Amino acid sequence: MRRFALGRPFVSGARRLSRGGLIDRSRSIRFRFNGKTYTGHPGDTLASALLAQGVRLFGRSFKYHRPRGIVGAGAEEPNALVQVGEAGYSTPNLRATQVELYEGLSAQTVNGWPSLKHDVGAINSMFSRILPAGFYYKTFMWPRSAWMRYEHFIRKAAGLGRTPEFPDPDIYDKRHIHCDVLIVGAGPSGLIAALTAARSGARVILADEQAQFGGSLLSASSTIGGTRAVDWVKKIVDELRTFPEVKLLNRSTVVGYFDHNFLTINSRRTHHLASGDSDPRMSRERLWRVRAGEVVLATGAIERPLVFDGNDLPGVMLSSAVTTYIRRYGVAPGRTGVVFTNNDSGYQAAIDMAWAGMKVVAIVDSRRFPGASVARETEALGIPVYKGHVISSARSGSEGLNRVELS
């Protein structure tokens, strides 16, 4: 068994890079998180802005209230649920990785009492042996009339957002629309599909949940035909905008796919704006009801986490998320790190970490024979590679993740 000490904790050493990313460093945005004021930049999400300032604790687990940090960089994020806004503008259970930063944004975590750092609910872990899965459905059954009182405290302890207590001042609308081709996802495949259909004269709708089109290319360091990936995306999108029969829907999630190519799309039209900055006549959200001749699903993929003891600790992140924070948001999520992988993408994450000035202690590859090209690149950077090994456990101290063990 090998042990690696990470030195200064992984996430507490996070910092903003002086180069790279798609953020506007010339402007600063002030916002509040859990009552404390922070600053970020246009192009940041709430998660990236907080990571850049060393925030590592974003929530508590559902049952034992174990500390939780950022794992992903988008819709796959399971931990960083926040309540955004106040009074009638309050919205619960949004992912910090999807909340775009704007001036005056106010957010707070949805659990942890009296505070996120000092959560009384963490005492539950001491009684884990007598709190099996679903214990509350078997334990609090008598007297039956008391269940509603039990439920109030059980749900509060679980920790989800609060339903707004004031009327919603915003407006919402819906639209019906027909198209020849609906493309779901605006990554490289979706963009090419949209451009090909548009050039044929078809009526096209391109929908993507992110603020910017490009998908994985927004955090890619590669080139396409000698052009930087982000510049290639801009070129394609600019051409798409010249077609009158093409509708581009960013910040829009396809939420339903029904018979006969009937789909529904939820467009978040003003979520990225402060309440006083949006046109009061403009709807906050719009539901598109689409009848499509053909549907192209170009939704990409989500990385699956590897399993080991302690993989839920703050500081354990998906390699794709690390790359995204470095390349798209200009944030190094730590000073040191270990990469655990079973495919070549982990090596690219290690290369990105080294580019960001992080010390990559090791790459742990469960395969005995990794891809030759990525192996050569990491060897040139002097990064040790442990082939045919796995991480068996991760441990943390008072300030964050500080040690991993291999087997």
Regions found by a protein language model. Name each.
Residues 2-407:
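Residues forming the flavin
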